[in-house]
Amino acid sequence: MDLEVVEFPLHHKLALPFRIGLLVIVGTWLWSVCYHLIYILNRYQPISPNPRGSLNSKWYHLLQIPLSNRHTDLEENTEFKANLVSPVDFHAGYCFAAILSISWATGFILFLKKTQGDIGGLYSHPIYPLLWVITAFILIVFPFPWRYRSSQRGLRKSIIRVFLFFQADFRSPYKDFIVSEIFTSYAKALGDFYIFGCVLQGHISKFTLRPDLKCDGTFFVPLAMAYPFIVAILQCLHYGLSRRKHTFKINLLSALKHATALPVIYLSAIIHAKQTKFTLTSGHGYLFWLWILSALLSSAYTFLWDVFIDWRIRFPFHKSINHKRFPMFIYAIGCFINFILRVTWSMKLHPRLHQFHEYEMGIFSFEMLEILRRFLWLFFHLDAISS
């Protein structure tokens, strides 16, 4: 196996931790913009009730909104919308994203200034790529005497519930479920971060080396990529078992949705490890066809779940859709874009992409498209919840 790294300038200037940081920062900005847009729409463009289109939605049980009281207790519904999107939340998101952007840009400029384009000394200054990570840790862990302290505390508690205990807050679980869903979009970035940890330990001398060369990458990188989906699966199962009478079936199906991603990740790792034993061309091995089948199944399941469950869009099976906020063609365009970007999720796990170092920025582009798709999903999901 060839260990030579092709020295593309863009690869070295935008090193791996900087690419991960860029994904996190863009996602934070888009999350804040999404919440801001939903807040404006809820305030200036209220939705007329449509009981016929919403009575069949099991998702309201998950959100702790009794269907019998949904249209009779307007005060409770208004209070729920107010708690769903608060100005303090997206203002804190803007502040958090701005601080991260400044720390990322500072580390990036210092990194380029120190290395001066010298490939030999490019990876000898790990503190600069990690500056945004240190900043994010401080913003989350250490309390600050600022106006957004409540949002900071809420984010910290949500992270602990989701990532350590695999739970969701029973009083308002939708935020914890959104956190776990967004975390799945960073599965590939989490695997890249493990590679960066190998670099810091001196096991890999270049960020652009393939992950299976050192650090048992054929096992730990797929495990790191699978962790967000494992978190989402356990969270759904825990909440479903705790609320068995109302939400067990829908949470079991949601856990199954996340579980469909695990075979794709596992088969990608196996094919990548055995790619020297067969050629991924016209004469594919049976593992490759299993990967194709699992990728199609996962993409189809998650796409249908996004449209019918998370967005509550019923066309073309219903004459009208539940939402009154936008015309039908807006939701149709959103579904089409979501389907196209769903395919890129599987494409970035394609085992053949790892055979060429020059595809590295292409894989990063796929990761950025997934962040954009998550913004689209979050917008229509919040639109469905607030309606």
Swiss-Prot record:
Higher taxonomy: Eukaryota, Fungi, Dikarya, Ascomycota, Taphrinomycotina
Annotated ranges, domain EXS: 212-387
InterPro entries, per database record: EXS_C
Topological category with respect to the lipid bilayer: Multi-pass membrane protein
PANTHER family membership: PROTEIN ERD1 HOMOLOG 2, XENOTROPIC AND POLYTROPIC RETROVIRUS RECEPTOR 1-RELATED
Highest taxon in the source lineage: Eukaryota
Gene Ontology CC annotation, any one: membrane
Entry protein name: Protein ERD1 homolog 2
